[in-house]
Each structure stands twice: as C-alpha cells, then as structure tokens.
Amino acid sequence: SDITGVNGEAEFVRPIYAGNAIATVTSSDAVKVITVRTSAFDAAPTGAGTGAITAVDNAVDCGLSRVVSEEIAQSERPELASASIVVSGGRGVGSEENFALIEKLADRLNAALGASRAAVDAGFIGNDHQVGQTGKIVAPDLYVAVGISGAIQHLAGMQGSKVIVAINK
C-alpha cells in the first residue's frame, strides 16, 4: 500500500516506518491490489487513454433517510493536495485567533491552508486541513510551516515538498 515507485510488473517501492525507510516489495499473486501515494507520480497527460464506462442503475430508496439541504463548499484557496504553495500552522501558533494570521498569509500567497494534527486537535482549524500521516499528503513547490514541531507523522505528509520554510520562535 502507499507505493511511491514501480520497478517492474511485480516489484514496488513503498515507505515504511512512517517514511523513515524505503522498502522494495514483490508480489507473486496474479491479481495485485495496490494503493498509490497521491504525490508520488506525475499526472497522466489529458486524453492519454480511454476506459470503459459502465452504466449502473440507481440504488433503491428505502425511505429511511432524507436530504435536508445540499450546499457546495466554496473557497478562494487552492485545493490542499494539489496546491503549488501550502502554508501550514501548528500548535506553536498558540490559539485560534493567532491561526487567523496563518490564514491571512495563505491568502496573500494564494496558497492552500494546512495544519499539523496538534493544531487540529487543539481546535485551531478543521481536520480537512490536516497534513501528515493521518491527514493529506502534499508535495508543493513551497511549503511554509509556522509553529510546527516537525513530528515524523507530519513530515510523512509533506516530505515531497520542493522547498520547505520553517518559522518558529
């Protein structure tokens, strides 16, 4: 799971020990089921291939639930997983009010907004902004980390960044 490279038809490369080591694994099974780390490979060119499209019937409505409302979440910021610049804050920011400064910096740089798990757990920001082993994996051109301790779980989510700027006290 979470492969970062393909060496052959049955040989794959994947991180282990929270990204501290790389393992080469092989599979002799005829059918292989793998997951791919989102930032590990370049995107395929648009229109590079075709795939079969199969229409399926709608599920039967059992009447046990109902839609109260539908709203599309909108943001001026780029999507976290595909942004070229990410500004992330950690517990070192100190408070939800101080985290608003991180949001302003992200807006000025037209960057996506990220956070460490500690900042999410402290209630500074929602978990949809979490970067790391239990959050999103990012690989921007520029990653700005403000008040982030550098826990290995967070590093696992942003180690593919081209340039990393860390700001701490």
Which positions does each model-derived feature cover?
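N-terminal glycine-rich FAD/FM-binding segment characteristic of electron-transfer flavoproteins
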Residues: S1-K169
